[in-house]
Amino acid sequence: MKKIFSFSLLLILGLVASQILPGMLGESYPAFRAGATTFLYVCLSFIMINVGREFEIDKKRWRSYAEDYFIAMATAAVPWLLIALYYVFVLLPPEFWGNGDAWKENLLLSRFAAPTSAGILFTMLAALRLKRSWMYRKIQVLAIFDDLDTILLMIPLQILMIGLRWQLFVVVVIVFLLLWLGWKKLSTYELRQDWWAILTYSVVVFGVTQLVYLLSKYYFGEEGSIHIEVLLPAFVLGMVMKTRHVESRGERMAASGISFLFMFLVGLSMPLFIGMTAATGEAASSVTGSQPMMSWGVIAFHVVIVSLLSNLGKLFPMFFYRDRKLSERLALSIGMFTRGEVGAGVIFIA
């Protein structure tokens, strides 16, 4: 519980800093922001490598995971769609209900409002002595698939937002090649897995993705550049490692410290919105951004409703696994409520 509170506090502190620092740093702020963004990507890569390391399945039983995968996909997609419907039919005036741009914008916004599973969930369940339970084993599989589906659902969103450009086909090919490599070489390579080694791999993953972007930008210009986010390459790198848990106080402190820094940097990455109006900047060119600014009380109300819709969507697994008691299925679904670092990373990538 202390760790969850720390994550939330650091996210809020980062958000506050994102509104204060632009005015304080003035012309130096773009350089500061670029440095902070680099650290954020490295931290995100570190987290995703560790998520991939937890992806431990018996490849001989791959058919039995098919149901789990589609349940996890629906568990990732249903909250997204519920929130999208709420954004369009509740937050927008009726004249925009049939507007294509409004739907595209709000499908994108709702993707980043919908939750993903949290790695801290496993620690919480283990602390409750549930590590040997059916719920723990099942939620471990669903949570990893939930994170993977969150990454894959970004692809149709990219197509929806920018159209069928050839660069997206390149990205899709790379995605499927990475997934194929991850499956074929699952838990194959004996690599060092101390925190500093994983941090080094994280820097390399970020460096490679940036190199692809810069080279494509050099040859094809900004419009033709290829963006490969660190989420999937880092996840696959974790998959191909032969998982070896290094248990020590120093390892736990380092991993927690990087997660804490990541949450602060996610908050820091938020754009300046205090003192801005709907007619300011790029907001005026979008349907959603051109709507009148709501009061803080109204915003808080909608946050509560969106949270309830998210959790309602996460109840999807309760309707499956009928061989288990309803109480177990409900506990499994409630366990998926938690918000994780992957979700924060997706918000940043937005």
List the model feature ranges, each with a label:
Residues 32-48, 100-117, 164-177, 222-236, ...:
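Structural signature of hydrophobic alpha-helical transmembrane segments
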Residues 1-57, 63-79, 193-204, 223-233, ...:
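Helical membrane-embedded segments and adjacent short helical loop/helix-boundary regions
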Residues 21-23, 61-130, 264, 272-350:
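Transmembrane alpha-helices that form the ion-translocation and gating core
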Residues 20-28, 53-61, 183-187, 212-221, ...:
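Transmembrane helix-loop junctions in multi-pass membrane proteins
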Residues 49-64, 119-132, 179-191, 237-252, ...:
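C-terminal ends of transmembrane helices
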Residues 148-151, 155-261:
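Core mid-bundle transmembrane helix pairs that form the ion/substrate translocation pathway
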Residues 70, 131-145, 152, 156, ...:
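Membrane-interface alpha-helices at helix entry/exit sites of multi-pass transporters
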Residues 40-51, 78-86, 105, 113-123, ...:
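Membrane-embedded alpha-helical core segments of multi-pass
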